[in-house]
A protein has these predicted regions:
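Cytosolic catalytic regions of ATP/NTP-dependent phosphoryl-transfer enzymes
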Residues: 1-135, 141, 151-155, 159-168
Length: 168
């Protein structure tokens, strides 16, 4: 949710909302233009989540975000320079290469995809909804150091342990 210019909620969602705001997209406006009518919640096994929306003009569209490799497995199309094209191995390799470049810069990368629907899904399960997607882009986020990390490192050093790398 966005209140007085501040995103409130899960850190990943806040980062995406803040980025969209920087691109000139207002969540408060979009929430009325794209009313959420259903979702397939995030699942760590699928590494993605999907929301389904009804537009002001009555169209139904789904948006899916998640791990790039998992999203790409479900994409049959890609949006390139505003044009929807069939997904092929060259496009897939280019996307995965850019994903690697971003990950090599210590960014946490999410892929975004969409699909226009003829009607609201009968069931909101991943097999029925998360298929035939159109890849629309990647976004990389910096994962800030958690507040408990510095004290944990100090505690390790005090105990004679030399931390080398902390992940996850």
């Amino acid at each position: 949710d966005v209140t007085e210019g501040t995103a409130i909620g899960e850190p990943t969602e806040c980062a995406l909302v803040n980025y969209a705001e920087k691109l000139g997209l207002s969540k408060n406006i979009k929430k009325y233009e794209y009313v959420r009518i259903g979702e397939v919640p995030f699942d760590s096994m699928r590494k993605m989540m999907t929301t389904v929306h009804k537009t002001a003009s009555g169209e139904i569209v789904q948006f899916t975000k998640g791990a790039p490799d998992e999203i790409l497995k479900r994409c049959s199309k890609a949006m390139i320079n505003g044009e929807v094209v069939d997904m092929n191995e060259d496009i897939r390799k280019t996307i995965l290469g850019e994903n690697k470049n971003m990950a090599d810069k210590a960014l946490r990368v999410l892929a975004a995809a969409m699909r226009p629907l003829k009607e609201e899904p009968v069931a909101y399960d991943s097999e029925a909804v998360e298929k035939d997607l159109c890849f629309v882009g990647l976004v990389g986020m910096i994962d800030p150091v958690r507040p408990e990390v510095k004290p944990a490192i100090d505690q390790c050093r005090t105990a004679g342990i030399r931390p080398i790398m902390i992940t996850g």
